[in-house]
Amino acid sequence: SDEHLLIVDKPSGVLVVPAAGRSGPTMVDVLKKQLGRPVTAVHRLDEETTGCLAFAFSEDARSGLDAIFRDHTAIRDYLALTTAVPSPESGCIESNLEEGRDGIVRVVRRGGRRGVTHYETVSRRGRGCLVRCRLETGRRNQIRVHLAALGCPVAGDRKYGYRARSGESFPRVMLHSSS
């Protein structure tokens, strides 16, 4: 951290900001209490996703960081443990994404918002693998939807296609924001 911004390692199971119909402390609440000063989330991570999360201490810092994210110049890398190997093992997924009334984000032919995820297989083990994903855009559940569309859902992601196999147990969506 410095006088303008703070990067934290977000744990699983914590919302970044308040959400309708949900209660409990958010990352913003926890940081305000710990630091004794206001903070603003610059971007969001899904509740179950762990890893790097940026906060701004001032409106100027938030505005500057917003511009970096809006212009897609922020490097946003994630690591995902998947239940199958993507084919091809590296590439770019580009599709339009739209959230339905049921809260599920889907790939759509018309409408929606453009989502672009670059991915590469880092290592393989059994039927699954570790995949590095770099976001070009940042849509809700983008990596989870894109990997599921490739036939290799993120381990533990029951919302987007993960089905437990015998002897397999993942306590959460196995997705981590690494930068």
Each model region followed by its residue ranges:
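RNA pseudouridine synthases
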Residues: S1-R106, R110-V116, R124-G126, M174
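Pseudouridine synthase
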Residues: S23-M27, L31, E99, G126-S179
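Generic signature of intrinsically disordered, low-complexity segments enriched in small/polar residues
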Residues: S58, H72, L81, V122, ...
